UniProtKB/Swiss-Prot annotation:
ATP binds at V5, V17, G42, P43, P44, G45, T46, G47, K48, T49, T50, N134, R192. This is Replication factor C subunit 4. One of its GO terms (biological process) is DNA repair. It comes from Encephalitozoon cuniculi (strain GB-M1) (Microsporidian parasite). PANTHER family: REPLICATION FACTOR C / DNA POLYMERASE III GAMMA-TAU SUBUNIT (PTHR11669), REPLICATION FACTOR C SUBUNIT 2 (PTHR11669:SF5).
């Protein structure tokens, strides 16, 4: 059985969901049969690599003129000096220009990027680069200046939801509307992640609900998280800490845990809670993820409540 991410991988530019303005620019390149050096940047699961491969295939129609590399595996200067440079110098019959797709280019060493800039300068007439990265600020500035930068934003939730409905119906996956909404929320604009979660639902013996999603993903129960917040807002501190400590001992990832608190606050429609939890989320996402960070957040919630009294 094919994985959903493979089965539903777009084969044409118009099949890629989201980022319509960027897709229009890429379509114009296909129509003109030409392209500059390109830098695709944006979060995971937004179609960068798929778009690059479709663009290369439509322009070349010839695999001999295409080199695909993942820079996280081949990130050093030797790759530039041997693989990339030799490919750029090679002649390919009936090929106006060659294309090098370099995925995860932001993982390349500075020395490797400096060497690659030189290759881009010398061979720009017969070889074009498509660099793909999550964080474009990690790309050497002289390389950025030689590329047209196309930004891929997180895919809108409504777009992901529509696509998941189509796929779940086509695959015969019985899933509640609430569960689909949760899948969309958990994927955070990442189409690939949403398909991976849906993949885990295929063998469900019954209708997939929110509890099933939470179980397979390994997240804390939203009801338990909401109860912790409710206890804090009622200033029942001892009970709230006891409930939280039980959740903490289950060894959830701190980032998953703080995101669960954030979702609970959204459901409770409390702007003040969202603000406090959002600040804690920022600290934890930067790697400061001890239990004390959560205790500090709880203190801020209590302080927030006392100011309202």
């Amino acid at each position: 059985m094919d994985l959903l991410v493979n089965k539903y991988q777009p084969s044409e530019i118009q099949d890629i969901v989201g980022n319509e303005a960027t897709m229009e620019l890429v379509s114009l390149m296909i129509e003109s049969r030409d392209m500059p050096h390109l830098l695709f940047t944006g979060p995971p699961g937004t179609g960068k690599t798929t778009c690059a491969k479709i663009l290369a295939r439509r322009l070349l129609g010839n695999k001999e003129g295409l080199l695909e590399l993942n820079a996280s595996d081949e990130r050093g200067i030797d790759t530039v000096r041997t693989t990339i440079k030799s490919f750029a110098q090679r002649r390919v019959k009936d090929c106006e220009f060659k294309i090098i797709i370099l995925d995860e280019a932001d993982s390349m060493t500075t020395t490797a990027q400096q060497a690659m800039r030189r290759v881009m300068e010398i061979h720009s007439s017969e070889c074009r680069f498509i660099l793909i990265c999550n964080v474009f600020t990690k790309i050497f500035e002289p390389i950025q200046s030689r590329c047209a930068i196309l930004r891929f934003d997180r895919i809108e939730q409504s777009v992901i939801l529509k696509r998941l409905k189509e796929i779940s119906e086509g695959e015969g996956i019985r899933i509640t509307a609430e569960a689909l909404d949760l899948v969309v929320e958990l994927s955070d604009g990442d189409m690939r992640q949403s398909l991976n979660i849906l993949q885990a639902c295929i063998n469900s013996p019954g209708t997939v609900d929110q509890d099933y999603i939470i179980k397979i993903i390994g997240l804390p129960s939203p009801k338990r998280i909401e109860k912790v917040l409710q206890r804090l807002l009622k200033r029942e501190v001892e009970e709230a800490l006891e409930m939280f400590d039980e959740i903490w001992e289950e060894k959830f990832d701190p980032l998953d845990l703080i995101n669960s608190f954030f979702r609970a606050a959204k459901n409770m429609e409390s702007y003040e809670l969202l603000k406090v939890i959002g600040l804690a989320n920022l600290r934890i996402s930067e790697g400061v993820n001890s239990r004390l960070q959560f205790y500090g957040m709880f203190w801020d919630i209590l302080d927030m409540g006392s100011k309202r009294l």
